[in-house]
A protein has these predicted regions:
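Predominant activation on well-ordered alpha-helical scaffold segments within soluble catalytic domains
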Residues: 1, 30, 84-87, 187-194, ...
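Conserved PLP-enzyme active-site core in the AAT-like
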Residues: 1-164, 169, 185
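Structural signal for hydrophobic packing residues in well-ordered secondary-structure cores
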Residues: 3-7, 40, 61, 90-94, ...
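Generic structural hydrophobic/aromatic packing signal, biased to beta-strands
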Residues: 19, 40, 103, 135, ...
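Catalytic cores of large soluble enzymes that bind and process phosphate-bearing ligands
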Residues: 21-25, 49-52, 74, 78, ...
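A short small-residue
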Residues: 66, 70, 189-196, 282
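Active-site C-terminal subdomain of aminotransferase-like
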Residues: 112-236, 241-246
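Non-catalytic terminal extensions of PLP-dependent enzymes
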Residues: 199-326
Length: 326
């Protein structure tokens, strides 16, 4: 809206807005662009640029760019996108073109991790181009699904034209939402958790998850079959790839199925566009995933790999049955 109002004031067209982001964004951004007729401009990730880090940004940003999305905890791998580095790339673009492009930080996961265990990392309003931040209460905020938060740098950064005022509830009330009636239970629970645990309590919870993720990634890194994509140093999420081995008769999808038989849901999937030839497997560590559980998982992982290594022929790849039928 800020972009549109500025363009209208300058008597310039407003019919082709675009949003720049990594090709590894969560599907919510694809939905946003689709629903609101915004052109998505995806900056491809690669093995050299595993996240949006400012590389090639000048090829995607122009006068119709309404913003750049930086992700604190990429869905595919859990890695942080370096917000400060992205901001510096936008500074260089502004010096050359005069375009003042702002950053929205998608902190769905990292927004509830970085403040507690990485306090010195500049990703928030300490970065001058960051004007809004969103996060989820139900990922690492320790609240059940359905709660999300968004904050702006200043009140003026939320355009007044987006706020509606209603008077039929017994007094004038501002509302900013796509829907109207929403349950308040999640908000109350988040408030309770903040009061109950406090900053130090959240720090201890998130640090424990982080320590477990680092233990798991360290154990997996020592196995000959795998190479880590990342090690869970950002949010407690990490992914790994299968090493090349000419006579191997299985892949990560086979390992996923074997782990599922033991009760572990560890998804395997291709990386996004331009990197789909790379398949990874990912672990998400959250509150409640104890060190004892991590040790049990590593034991089962090694058992599954040993079973698959003992196959005389490749696993069948057609019409694989799922363990879920409900």
């Amino acid at each position: 809206r800020r972009w549109k109002e500025a363009r209208e004031k300058a008597d310039l067209p407003t019919d082709h807005p675009n949003l720049v982001m990594s090709s590894a964004v969560q599907v919510c951004w694809e939905k946003f662009c689709n629903y609101f007729d915004v052109e998505p401009r995806y900056v491809p990730i690669s093995e050299d640029h595993k996240v949006l880090d400012g590389h090639d940004l000048d090829k995607y940003v122009d006068e119709n760019t309404i913003g750049v999305v930086a992700i604190m905890g990429v869905t595919y791998t859990g890695m942080y996108e370096p917000v400060e580095q992205i901001s510096e790339a936008l500074d260089r673009i502004e010096e050359r073109t005069g375009l003042d492009v702002r950053i929205h930080v998608d902190g769905a996961s990292g927004g509830m991790i970085a403040p507690f265990i990485q306090p010195d990392l500049a990703w928030d309003f300490r970065v001058k181009r960051v004007y809004s931040i969103s996060t989820s209460g139900h990922k690492y905020g320790l609240v059940y699904p359905g709660l999300g938060w968004v904050v702006w740098r200043e009140t003026a950064d939320l355009p007044e034209s987006l706020i509606f005022k209603v008077s039929y509830l017994g007094g004038e009330m501002p509302t900013f939402a796509l829907n109207f009636s929403r349950p308040g239970a999640q908000v109350l629970l988040q408030y309770y958790m903040f009061l109950r645990l406090g900053f130090d309590g959240y720090r201890r919870v998130q640090q424990t998850s982080h320590d477990v993720a680092k233990y798991l990634s360290g154990e997996i890194e020592q196995m000959d079959d795998f190479t880590l994509w990342n090690d869970g140093s950002d949010i407690p999420v990490f992914a790994w790839m299968l090493n090349d081995k000419p006579d191997r008769k299985w892949n990560l999808y086979d390992l996923q199925d074997r782990l599922r038989m033991k009760g572990w849901l560890v998804p395997a999937y291709p990386m996004p566009v331009d990197l789909t030839q790379v398949t990874v497997q990912r672990i998400v560590v959250r509150n409640g995933f104890s060190h004892d559980m991590a040790e049990a998982f590593i034991k089962d992982l090694k058992s599954c790999v040993k079973y698959l290594d003992g196959l005389r022929s490749p696993m069948p790849s057609e019409a694989r049955a799922s363990g879920f039928h409900h």
